[in-house]
A protein has these predicted regions:
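Conserved coupling/switch loops of ABC nucleotide-binding domains, chiefly the family-specific signature
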Residues: 56-59, 210
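Non-catalytic connector elements of ABC transporters
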Residues: 238, 248-366
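Conserved ABC transporter NBD signature motif
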Residues: 58-70
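ABC ATPase nucleotide-binding domains
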Residues: 81-83, 87, 91, 96-230
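The feature captures the beta-strand-to-loop junction immediately N-terminal to the Walker
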Residues: 35-37
Length: 366
């Protein structure tokens, strides 16, 4: 199984820069998600790894093998031992499931047991004679995965393979696919615009912003320790409040809060991130910031409560809770903070309305 190494990769279309000096290391046998908005360049990066596109600059290595240096060395896609799962699955409608899976195999392999083994691996044993139109969307994606795994690739690339599935199917299918890839032992790279998908599936997540890797880390570290406020809001709901650093704590209208590990200003004004699940609600007599419930949304596994602090120094806060009776708008509650918070210097990459969506307009080819 091969690692993937990308160094200084750049790509432009018609004079418009799509990727600019991208560096990425994907360890052997790991699962990496490249997360970004539509038009951020993530699919272009995946196509360069696959060999469908050539970079304008930079190098791509699969293991120790140089497969593209943007000038002289180039190994075509069919010689890279890569499996590719496109967005729509792209099954051949006139071929049965078994023949779709066997499409990339040498003739002698077609007569063997490989197809049956793969269909069993993806949970579709016994469906070899069916046709794509007889399958659900989730089953079609699993056939596409089986086809990608058929030649025993060392690397599997997935280009937003779950985006066309119904929300009710998406979580279960991605869990199935993740399990299959783990069993196969292949190095896997997923590109997606779905934060939940990236955080739940990957060993490491690389966030692509404006054609460069803005941050790469484990899912939990990215979510808890984003590099700036803009990334914090891209990765999930975030309450951003003003504060002042004093020693090892930050003074805010929510109280004096412990700061998370990592680089932080030693003094002065900062932006403070409090995730919704860090906020705790109590009754009006509970110590904390006195607030009024504005709305309550129930989602089954949890609920989202929006509260407006009464002291005037705080914006509306988003709180995520589990259990308890529904909260009626107008109810007075006390709000407190649990755990350490992330801080950044004021003005350091502030969130911009529509910042991530604007990437879609900036780039139309990626």
């Amino acid at each position: 199984v091969k690692s993937v190494s990308i160094a200084g990769v750049a790509k432009s279309f018609g004079g418009l820069s799509v990727l600019s000096g991208v560096d990425l290391e994907v360890p052997s046998g790991s699962f990496t998600a490249i997360l970004g908005s539509s038009g951020s360049g993530k699919t272009t990066l995946l196509r360069i790894i696959a060999g469908f596109e050539r970079p304008d600059a930079g190098v791509v290595r699969l293991g120790q093998r140089l497969v593209d240096d943007a000038e002289h060395q180039f190994v075509p896609c069919e010689r890279r031992r890569i499996g590719y799962v496109p967005q729509e699955g792209a099954l051949f409608p006139h071929l049965s499931v078994g023949r779709n899976v066997a499409f990339g195999l040498a003739r002698q392999d077609r007569r063997g047991t490989r197809v049956g083994e793969l269909l069993e691996l993806v949970g579709l044993a016994g469906l070899a004679r069916r046709y794509p139109h007889q399958l659900s969307g989730g089953q079609q994606q699993r056939v596409a995965l089986a086809r990608a795994l058929a030649p025993d690739p060392e690397i599997v690339l997935l280009d937003e393979p779950f985006s066309s599935l119904d929300a009710s199917l998406r979580a279960s299918v991605r869990a199935d696919v993740h399990g299959v890839l783990r069993l196969a032992g292949a190095t896997s790279i997923l590109v997606t615009h779905d934060q939940d998908e990236a955080l739940s599936m990957a060993d490491q997540v690389a966030i692509l912003r404006g054609g460069v890797i803005a941050q790469i880390n484990t899912p939990s570290s990215l979510y808890s320790l984003p590099r700036d406020a803009e990334l914090a809001q891209f990765l999930g709901e975030a309450n951003l409040v003003e504060g002042t650093v004093s020693g090892k704590t930050v003074q805010t209208a929510l109280g004096d809060l412990a700061m998370a590990a990592g680089p932080a200003p030693s003094a002065g004004p900062v932006r403070v991130m409090v995730r919704p699940e860090q906020l705790i609600l109590g009754d009006a007599a509970t110590p904390g910031v006195s607030s009024v419930v504005r709305s309550y949304e129930y989602f089954g596994h949890d609920a989202v409560v929006r509260v407006l602090p009464e002291n005037g120094g705080l914006p509306e806060l988003v709180v995520r809770i589990t259990g308890g009776a529904p909260l009626v708008p107008g109810t007075r509650v006390g709000v407190s903070v649990h755990g350490a918070v992330m801080v950044w210097p004021t003005g350091d990459r502030e969130p911009r309305p529509g910042a991530w969506e604007s990437e879609r307009e900036r780039i139309t080819h990626a």
